[in-house]
Amino acid sequence: MPLSPAGVLSSTSTASNRSRNRPRYRTKALSSEVDESLFGGIKPLNQSDSPIVLLRDKHAIRKTLTALGLDHKPETIQLITRDMVRELIIPTKDPSGESLIMSPEEFERIRWASHVPTREELEAKEQACKKEKEAIVDAVTTRKKIMKQKEMVSRNNQKLSDLEEVAKERAQNLLQRASQLRMEQEEELKDMKKIILNAKCHAIRDAQILEKQLIQKELDAEEKRLDQMMEVERQKSIQRQEELDKKRREERIRGRRHIVEQMEKNQEERSLLAEQREQEKEQMLEYMEQLQEEDLRDLERRHQQKLKMQAEIKRINDENQKQKAELLAQEKLADQMVMEFTKKKMAREAEFEAEQERIRREKEKEISRLRALQEKVQDYQAEQDALRAKRNQEVADREWRRKEKENAQKKMETEAQLRKSRLEQVAFKEHSLAVQVQRDRDEFERILRAQREQIEKEQQEEEKKAMERLQHANELRRQVRENQQKQVQDRIAIFEEGQRLKEEAQKRRERIEGIKKKKIEELRATGLPEKYCIEAERKANIPTNTSVN
């Protein structure tokens, strides 16, 4: 289906946004190659093949549509269903005529070339290459033997023909190539390849780091400029705030002056009102003194009752101390309950005092109300209020005595319940202690039996292991004697093999060192900076004086 103009425009804007967001690409590898077949091949298309059509980039399609005057909204059909309305684009032919058509074989070749092999595939490919190289080496070795045999047969000091010279040169080149491929598979040369690749990567990375540092400097300069702009704006804001604070201080000063004037005026009014109230206070002072004397007598009486109650509590506490000597653990719980009872009683007394305080405040309120009405019926109302207050006080006293009596009765019942609970707790703890002692005795006997059985079992296993160790020691002595005889024979063979391997290793090291030096020279020839070449020589353990030109 061809792309619609709207789709081309949206894809173009999306591509441009992505190009702005991506970092700028810089070419690092100058020897990169591009598969030119992606841009259209010269090979004629076989009409019998099934073509695969690949659209080119959207920018080219958009330009083509604009040039041909076909950049318009495509024809659509509106499809109305039960739950939605859709517009379907009617497919048309490709108006540009620039679609790339390639054969299935070419498409499969490109797809296979773009495939990223896995680690297993790479290992399998490496094994296949290794086997192929070994086969080539074997073939070359066989051909070399044949050539030597032919040379020995035909050695008659006569000059070789041109064809024989070419064959000989070709065989030598093939043999040299096979030897080089075999050396490339050595671990040292593989490590050398990694070192060279690492040096190239370091050079690229340093160039990228330098570029990032330049970008960071530009960003820092821009950030510094923005900070300076923000600092100027902040100074202006501080100046505006100081002016606003100055105006507010002036307004507060004017407000204080107005308040002082108002306070002076109110002070004069309060002075006049205070003189009037002073006269009223003198009239009510005698009445208040009488009420205070009654309150003092009432407080003294309550104080005496409190002392009696405290004496009773002290007596109870003394009894508890005696019982505590006998049952220390149970007495702790009892003391806690007594203290809780005391706290509750003190709370009740506080409530009573609060009630008395409330009554006193009500009296003061009543006095204030009487003061407002004293001009009319001051004497008569005062006597009635005093009698009413006295009756209220008597009722409150009777109620308090009734509550105290009930509290004393509850206290006695609580103490009886506590004594009963203590006795039950003592009996329960004695029973629990006896049960626990019996359980401990049974557990001790069970553990003792298990330990005896374990000791017997361990003794049997120890005897069995001692017998096995004896047999194993005899077997080891026999094997040691056999191994000593075998080692004498192996040392002789190893010494001979070692001499041969030492000579081969020396030759191999010389060949590898030569290849390493050659690769370092090739690396210098690519134009890589000298410091990376020196680092590669150091990692490859190549002497510097032998590698520097």
UniProtKB/Swiss-Prot annotation:
Keyword Coiled coil found: yes
Cell compartment(s), UniProt: Cytoplasm, Cytoskeleton, Cilium axoneme; Cytoplasm, Cytoskeleton, Flagellum axoneme; Cell projection, Cilium; Cell projection, Cilium, Flagellum
Keyword set, alphabetical order: Cell projection, Cilium, Coiled coil, Cytoplasm, Cytoskeleton, Flagellum
Residue stretches in coiled coil: 119-232, 259-393, 434-522
Keyword Coiled coil: yes
Region called Disordered, residue ranges: 1-29, 388-416
InterPro entries for this protein: CFAP45, TPH_dom
UniProt-listed GO biological process terms: flagellated sperm motility
Signal peptide interval: none
Tissue: Expressed in respiratory cells (at protein level).
Cellular component GO terms, alphabetical: 9+2 motile cilium; axonemal B tubule inner sheath; axonemal microtubule; axoneme; cilium; sperm flagellum
Domain of life: Eukaryota
Subunit structure comment from the entry: Microtubule inner protein component of sperm flagellar doublet microtubules. Interacts with AK8; dimerization with AK8 may create a cavity at the interface of the dimer that can accommodate AMP. Interacts with CFAP52. Interacts with ENKUR. Directly interacts with DNALI1. Interacts with DNAH11. Interacts with DNAI1.
Family stated for the protein in its record: Belongs to the CFAP45 family.
Function as written in the Swiss-Prot or TrEMBL entry: Microtubule inner protein (MIP) part of the dynein-decorated doublet microtubules (DMTs) in cilia axoneme, which is required for motile cilia beating. It is an AMP-binding protein that may facilitate dynein ATPase-dependent ciliary and flagellar beating via adenine nucleotide homeostasis. May function as a donor of AMP to AK8 and hence promote ADP production.
PANTHER family named in the record: CILIA- AND FLAGELLA-ASSOCIATED PROTEIN 45, NASOPHARYNGEAL EPITHELIUM SPECIFIC PROTEIN 1
Protein name: Cilia- and flagella-associated protein 45
Organism name: Sus scrofa
Gene it is expressed from: CFAP45
